[in-house]
A protein has these predicted regions:
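N-terminal Lys/Arg-rich, disordered targeting/topogenic segments
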Residues: 1-6
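Hydrophobic membrane-insertion alpha-helices, especially the h-region
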Residues: 9-27
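Aromatic-capped interface at the extracytoplasmic side
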Residues: 25-40, 44
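Right-handed parallel beta-helix
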Residues: 40-53, 62-64, 70, 86-168, ...
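Beta-strand elements of well-folded, non-transmembrane domains
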Residues: 60-62, 79-81, 108, 139, ...
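A cross-taxa feature marking solvent-exposed loop/turn segments within ectodomains of secreted
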Residues: 84-86, 207-208
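Short, surface-exposed interaction patches in beta-rich subdomains
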Residues: 164-165, 169-257
Length: 257
């Protein structure tokens, strides 16, 4: 009797699974399934002449910061997400006393099917010097290309950070991603930390003076700059501090772009 009841429950469960699967297939074909994807594309612009500090924040997706022509900062959010979530993402830009904040707002915080979301935020900045450029993302990579700033602050929980800049103070932090910073020359302090990723600092011009503080628990440390010895080049100079628990650390001269 008990065995028959268990068999009936098992059959009912299998039947419900089959019905659910068929229902999802039908909904997908009708374009109403949670698995159906849609294209997201939205953009906003803001005047550059009112900006000295720029803060960019998004919880999901990659961030590219690139130089552009013109007099406005241009923010473009594009990618794919489930059709049910298309209205959940929007750009929000605010300005206050010289600081411009660009943020991707996610109205619905909890979804079962967020693994299908693939977004990219591209910020175009005119060729004007910023005091500070700050980029923060929870799950995506960060790339900064030739944008002028006195200070760069990059934070990503799980993504990689890559920078191609002329010079400036650098503060870069990520938990699991790699950090690569390529500069024309090292004239200001650099601080970079990654729990598990490699950290590479590249300079086209060898520094005449430099101080380093390098800490890698299980990774290798490699510095191939000319005249580098025991953590120093010459006397004084900017400080390059690199920290990684399991990643490799490297400072090198390269041929440039």
């Amino acid at each position: 009797m008990l065995k028959n009841r268990f068999r009936n429950i098992t059959r009912l469960a299998l039947l419900l699974i089959v019905i659910g699967a068929i229902g999802n297939v039908v909904l997908y074909m009708l374009g109403k399934s949670p698995f159906n994807l849609g294209e997201l594309s939205t953009e906003q612009s803001v005047r550059m002449d009112q900006t000295t500090n720029l803060l960019i924040h998004t919880e999901t997706g990659t961030v590219d910061v690139v130089p552009i022509k013109g007099h406005e900062i241009k923010a473009v959010l594009e990618g794919k997400t489930t059709k049910q979530s298309l209205e959940d993402y929007r750009l929000n830009i605010t300005q206050d006393q010289g600081q411009t904040r660009i943020e991707v707002i996610q109205d619905s915080k909890f979804r079962f099917f967020d693994i299908y979301t693939n977004l990219k935020l591209t910020i175009g900045i005119p060729e004007t010097q910023l005091n500070q450029l700050q980029v923060m993302t929870d799950t995506g990579n960060i790339y900064v290309d030739s944008v002028l700033a006195s200070e760069y602050r990059m934070i990503s929980d799980t993504g990689a950070i890559k920078m191609d800049i002329k010079e400036g103070v650098i503060k870069a932090e990520t938990n699991t991603g790699a950090i690569t910073a390529s500069l024309d020359h090292i004239l200001q302090d650099i601080y970079a930390i990654s729990d598990t990723g490699d950290i590479i600092i590249q300079t086209a011009e060898a520094p005449q003076a430099l101080r380093t503080k390098l800490s890698a628990d299980s990774g290798t440390i490699k510095v191939t700059l000319p005249n580098y010895q025991d953590g120093y080049i010459g006397e004084g100079g900017p400080l390059v501090e690199l920290i990684s628990d399991t990643g490799d650390l490297e400072i090198e001269q390269y041929s440039g772009k």
